[in-house]
Amino acid sequence: MNKKIILSISLVGFLSLANAQTEKQIPEVTIASKSLQEINKSGKNVTLLTQKDLEKYKGQTLSDVLERITNFQITGSFNNNSEPKTLRVRGGDNNVVILIDGIPMKDVTTIKNNVMDIRLLSLENIESIEILNGASSVLYGSNAGTAVIDIKTKKNSYKKIDAAFGMRGGSYGTFAQNADISGKLGIFNYHISGFNEKSDGLSSAEGDDSFDKDGFEKQALNAKAGISLKNFNFNLNGGWNHHLFKYDNGAFSDGENRGNDKQAYLGGNANFLYRNGQLTLNTRFSNNKRIGETFIGNSYQEQYSYEGKDFFAELFNRYDFNKNIQLTAGLQYENQKMNENENSSFDAFANALFTYRFVHLEAGTRLTNHSKFGNQWTYSANPYLYQELGSSFIKLGYSFATAFISPTLYQSFGSLPYVLPNPDLKPETSLSHEINISFGKKDRSLLISAAVFNRKEQDVFGYYTDPFTYLGIYKNISENTTKGFEVDFNYQLTSKIGFGGNFSFVEKENHAAMKRQPKQRVNSYIEILPFKGSRVLISHLFVGGRADAYYDSLTYSTREVILSDFNLFNASISQQINPKLSFYLNLNNILNKEYTDVVGYTTKNRNFTFGMNYRF
């Protein structure tokens, strides 16, 4: 019976959260070409979550939202909130680029891929999310092997002063508060936001009642200010994020450990519009500090400490030769430091878009000169057909692209005495083919899309341990081929009923590289607006079986396991009392399903969040 119910819900459309909208204005995105473009006309299928979409997920985490995106697997998403979250997109392993307001945000203290820790980001400060699947190194450089995620922070108000406040509480002794104030004074605009969250949590490691809870707390403060003129705008932005959390020794192993992560950043953005194009300057400096401590005797004592700094600067120009030819070209510089180690890179890139009636061709190339491994070329070609049929559209495209992943400072320089340096470590490279098709309404009230892809990876990073000295080192040890397909469906049946979802499939020739990655995933949802100001959202998630492994401290060996598939049902209810006040209730894992996300670590049982928002 349960299988019939699950199948019925899944067949309501191969279901996806992505982009259910009823606005008549066609939304525009910047992620596909680095400049504003109607989302339907981009060469690849782009996922857009507007503020209206994110309203459905109040009180949840960013990983909760990304879990609903096609072919996204956020490992650790269903464990204790303080546990690490790994983004696995289309079978990749954290090889994504995260942008904040169009500018890369990186953490150079990480072991691999320098991906920002998404635990530091609160949904309360996010206006919208744009996602571009597939290799995108031509526009975004290293790490853009499987996806680019652009997180747009809250917009400034057009009033002189506007303020909002929110608070929530729920299971595991979790309480959070957020506030923001923004406004516009003539040509000047500003926005300040703050966030605080504390939780008793649950035991990170799976075990008996003697395992203590691993709580956490997070604080964030963000600010931006700028000026807006007719043909020029400039803004400064900065922020501080803090995450203090307890964690256990490992799978099935309790412990008294504490992590203390801090991130600070300062950046700027300037845009100059002229008759035939736009000139853009992006800069950002970020500093990350990570401290790990273990409780020994009667106090916490430091076990490790890393500090990393990243400086990024980019200047690019979009020029429209005419309505049929557009060229975007630019320069990029990045410098990374961690403790005493450092590397830098200088990039030049160009990307052109040619249009003739319904035929389009996007092609580009990038040259990266890296202080560690020299020159690296990447290139892409994306021919596609786009035709509007009244209020509808249809698009069919093919893309061919290369991408690369630079070794991190940790992988290149090691961490003595445990990890040896490898000065000969080369970048990991990939070659991707993709065919995509989409059909729907231009206002996105109906959207059907599908994609099939094949990605060949070479010089994949691997960690090798010497069996005699037990010292480790990172090497280029393997190659692999990943293939899969994905389907999205979203339909706004009436002004009060919408449904949709997604199905994704991915597999690798080297099955050992599929650790913690399912072959199949299904998301589905139905949204109902029963009364004025009311919203009811019911969602379903299916995650297929996965291979996993853990270190057994009793046998001093690694044990491999196969994790069972699982289904989760969630519900969200919200009520707008008046234009200023609203309430919401989230119910997760309604059926109280027992399941495993990561072997040896506790997953969340039935839980809830209740909250309110007030706008002054």
What are these regions (language model features)?
Residues 38, 63, 67-104:
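Extracytoplasmic beta-strand/coil segments of soluble accessory domains associated
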